């Protein structure tokens, strides 16, 4: 029996002029055995964390409105490479049928995700849960869509006549315990396990909570989400985690690529929204990104993880208001994060 070939991975495009040997941003590790968009900034009703919390800080007047990408050279997916921060093949031997064992969560976290994030700020894991589980998640998401649970994605600060000029997705927020969302809950628990194993090793962050899962659908009518930053104003979110559900996705035909523009680099990373692919990246201004127009139905599930210290500061800022005067809140007026 043969091990499965290493999957494709996103690579940072070389700067204009084609400098040889440009570094890859992220890579792809195989997780199972067989890139969304960040969206509306979550408010307190969307959080899963001990205690109660504020919504994000309102973008300031200095913040430029979302803008379209300047159009540097297009990045492409390439065969997996080696080394920390690059693609990591699964280990642990082969199953009798030749399938590769899933990489244990602890090993995946410490030997791949941590070095990849700390080096590049972007990390891709392919075949995260396996085909069967990924299919079950997709079935649950499509059922939510078919029963009218999705609403138009909203913006925190309205700087356009229509939010659809900026983002064209439809979303719903899921805790993971709702009837019919059990496998989505399993996905969220699996994400939590990875982050727990990374605890204390992702930059200087002390991660202690997350949002609910934002399930997003681009309906395939050519809409996307213009270039933006998830957390431009210190609302507490430090890591964006996106899971994709799109089988047999062909970006050349259907578009829908998530393009990330790492801060201070004349390079970008293109992440195709492939089935059972998990993506991590820093949520702050280091990673402006956009969802390019999608011409087929495109599903993704996004969770944001909180840094404890920044989240606490954001709560104080929210409760004291603009002038530093504490705002009195009625009982239960701020939703708990659990």
From Swiss-Prot:
Cell compartments where the protein resides? Cytoplasm; Nucleus
How is this chain modified after translation?
S-nitrosylation inhibits the enzyme activity up to 60% under aerobic conditions. Chelation of Fe(2+) has no effect on the S-nitrosylation. It is uncertain whether nitrosylation occurs on Cys-238 or Cys-241.
Q: Which residues form the Fe2OG dioxygenase domain?
A: 209-307
Please give the chief subcellular localization of this protein: cytoplasm
The UniProt entry's GO biological process terms, in alphabetical order, are: cardiac muscle tissue morphogenesis; cellular response to hypoxia; heart trabecula formation; intracellular iron ion homeostasis; intracellular oxygen homeostasis; labyrinthine layer development; negative regulation of CAMKK-AMPK signaling cascade; positive regulation of apoptotic process
Binding locations of 2-oxoglutarate? 298
Official protein name in the record: Egl nine homolog 1
Q: Which organism is it from?
A: Rattus norvegicus
What is the name of the gene encoding this protein? Answer: Egln1
């Amino acid at each position: 029996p043969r091990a499965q070939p290493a999957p494709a991975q996103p690579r940072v495009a070389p700067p204009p002029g084609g400098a040889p040997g440009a570094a890859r941003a992220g890579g792809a590790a195989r997780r199972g055995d067989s890139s969304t968009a960040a969206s509306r900034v979550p408010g307190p009703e969307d959080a899963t964390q001990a205690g109660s919390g504020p919504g994000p800080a309102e973008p300031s007047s200095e913040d430029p409105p979302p803008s379209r990408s300047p159009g540097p050279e297009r990045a492409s997916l390439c065969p997996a490479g080696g080394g920390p921060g690059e693609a990591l093949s699964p280990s642990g031997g082969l199953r009798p049928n030749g399938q590769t064992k899933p990489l244990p969560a602890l090993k995946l976290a410490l030997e791949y995700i941590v070095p990849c994030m700390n080096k590049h700020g972007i990390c891709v894991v392919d075949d995260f849960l396996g085909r069967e589980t990924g299919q079950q998640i997709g079935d649950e998401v499509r059922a939510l869509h078919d029963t009218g649970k999705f609403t138009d994605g909203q913006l925190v600060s309205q700087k356009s006549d229509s939010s659809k000029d900026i983002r064209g997705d439809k979303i719903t927020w899921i805790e993971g315990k709702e009837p019919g969302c059990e496998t989505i809950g399993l996905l969220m628990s699996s994400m939590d396990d990875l982050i727990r194993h990374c605890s204390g090793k992702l930059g200087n962050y002390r991660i202690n909570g997350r949002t609910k899962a934002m399930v997003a659908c681009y309906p395939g009518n050519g809409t996307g989400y213009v270039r933006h930053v998830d957390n431009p104003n210190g609302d507490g979110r430090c890591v964006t985690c996106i899971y994709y559900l799109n089988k047999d996705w062909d970006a050349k035909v259907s578009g829908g690529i998530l393009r990330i523009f790492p801060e201070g680099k004349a390079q970008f990373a293109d992440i195709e929204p492939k089935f059972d692919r998990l993506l991590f990246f820093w949520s702050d201004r280091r990673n402006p990104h956009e969802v390019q127009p999608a011409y087929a139905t495109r599903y993704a599930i996004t969770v944001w993880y909180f840094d404890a210290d920044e989240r606490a500061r954001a709560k104080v800022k929210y409760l004291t208001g603009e002038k530093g005067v504490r705002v009195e809140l009625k009982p239960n007026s701020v939703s708990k994060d659990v």
